[in-house]
């Protein structure tokens, strides 16, 4: 399991980055979600890696 926390704002980001964050369930700064680690989630993290902090649970 991965704990993904949004650390930076989505304001002014490219639309694909905003949609990726929303697809992960991240909408507000400081919000965290737990996801199972797989290729799809890892690709999403690569897209918005500079906006989030990822921890292994």
From Swiss-Prot:
GO terms for molecular function: structural constituent of ribosome. The gene is rpmD. CDD domains: Ribosomal_L30. Pfam families: Ribosomal_L30. It comes from the Bacteria. This is Large ribosomal subunit protein uL30. InterPro entries: Ribo_uL30_ferredoxin-like_sf, Ribosomal_uL30_bac-type, Ribosomal_uL30_ferredoxin-like. Part of the 50S ribosomal subunit. The keyword Ribonucleoprotein applies. It comes from Acholeplasma laidlawii (strain PG-8A). Keywords: Ribonucleoprotein, Ribosomal protein. GO terms for cellular component: cytosolic large ribosomal subunit. Belongs to the universal ribosomal protein uL30 family. GO terms for biological process: translation.
